[in-house]
Amino acid sequence: MDGCGTYLDTMRREAPLVQCITNFVAMNVVANVLLAAGASPAMVHDAEESGEFAAIAQALTINMGTPSPRWVEGMEAAARGATAAGRPWVLDPVAVGATAFRRGLGARLLALKPTVIRGNASEILALAGAETRGKGADSADPVAAAEAAAQRLAESSGAVVAVTGPVDFVTDGRRGIRCANGHPLMPRVTALGCSLTGIVGAFAAIRPPFEATAAALAFFGLAGEEAAKTATGPGSFQVAFLDALHALSPEALDRGARLEAA
């Protein structure tokens, strides 16, 4: 896929407002990642306003990391509000296969028609109803093992599905693309997966979801590669990663994106 830099340039010029219903662990990191990339985060999650706010925002992201009954009400209200207003929304089904509570929540959110679903291989397998070896929020399954399930899930839900790992896979049920950008230090920092969901939301706000998701993955992964050039470990990597998101130019993204048709 060509032209990732154009997607980045448009996202930065429009600075979309992204409503993020994410978890306690990730909230600060996600907000800083979106700001560094050029978007505008809003951490609005309470059911009293989440649905109304979803109609104002340009995109919504819902992360299942630390659900509670009240937060679930906010998630469902926001998803309904985004869908009614024609806003794209991204589902991050964190540890969806771990408990009956999470499986039920994942099924209800899936029924509310997300635009994009982004998860690791075990999460996508579980959401698709397939066997998985996941352990909590971590994946014990390789991306390749979830590609067929991702295609089925995309076909049945109408969503673009992104399976993220060392080499990411994105599908809309008809087309597929792989992204090889990224660095081994990225999984050593908490909330980067949650932050990637936020970036996918920012790109989906201004581009068709399949292309937007692929461009977002390339941008995020390439920023990780750039950050690793100066980092000495996970601590310094966090700071360097924010700087790389801010500094990465559309031209550099065009040169460095490693995307190929699947």
UniProtKB/Swiss-Prot annotation:
<dbReference type="InterPro" id="IPR029056">
    <property type="entry name" value="Ribokinase-like"/>
</dbReference>
<dbReference type="GO" id="GO:0009229">
    <property type="term" value="P:thiamine diphosphate biosynthetic process"/>
</dbReference>
<protein>
    <recommendedName>
        <fullName>Hydroxyethylthiazole kinase</fullName>
        <ecNumber>2.7.1.50</ecNumber>
    </recommendedName>
</protein>
<feature type="binding site">
    <location>
        <position position="118"/>
    </location>
    <ligand>
        <name>ATP</name>
    </ligand>
</feature>
<keyword id="KW-0784">Thiamine biosynthesis</keyword>
<dbReference type="GO" id="GO:0009228">
    <property type="term" value="P:thiamine biosynthetic process"/>
</dbReference>
<dbReference type="GO" id="GO:0005524">
    <property type="term" value="F:ATP binding"/>
</dbReference>
<keyword id="KW-0418">Kinase</keyword>
<feature type="binding site">
    <location>
        <position position="43"/>
    </location>
    <ligand>
        <name>substrate</name>
    </ligand>
</feature>
<dbReference type="GO" id="GO:0004417">
    <property type="term" value="F:hydroxyethylthiazole kinase activity"/>
</dbReference>
<dbReference type="InterPro" id="IPR000417">
    <property type="entry name" value="Hyethyz_kinase"/>
</dbReference>
<keyword id="KW-0547">Nucleotide-binding</keyword>
<comment type="function">
    <text>Catalyzes the phosphorylation of the hydroxyl group of 4-methyl-5-beta-hydroxyethylthiazole (THZ).</text>
</comment>
<comment type="pathway">
    <text>Cofactor biosynthesis; thiamine diphosphate biosynthesis; 4-methyl-5-(2-phosphoethyl)-thiazole from 5-(2-hydroxyethyl)-4-methylthiazole: step 1/1.</text>
</comment>
<comment type="similarity">
    <text>Belongs to the Thz kinase family.</text>
</comment>
<keyword id="KW-0067">ATP-binding</keyword>
<feature type="binding site">
    <location>
        <position position="191"/>
    </location>
    <ligand>
        <name>substrate</name>
    </ligand>
</feature>
<feature type="binding site">
    <location>
        <position position="164"/>
    </location>
    <ligand>
        <name>ATP</name>
    </ligand>
</feature>
<keyword id="KW-0808">Transferase</keyword>
<keyword id="KW-0479">Metal-binding</keyword>
<keyword id="KW-0460">Magnesium</keyword>
<dbReference type="Pfam" id="PF02110">
    <property type="entry name" value="HK"/>
</dbReference>
<dbReference type="GO" id="GO:0000287">
    <property type="term" value="F:magnesium ion binding"/>
</dbReference>
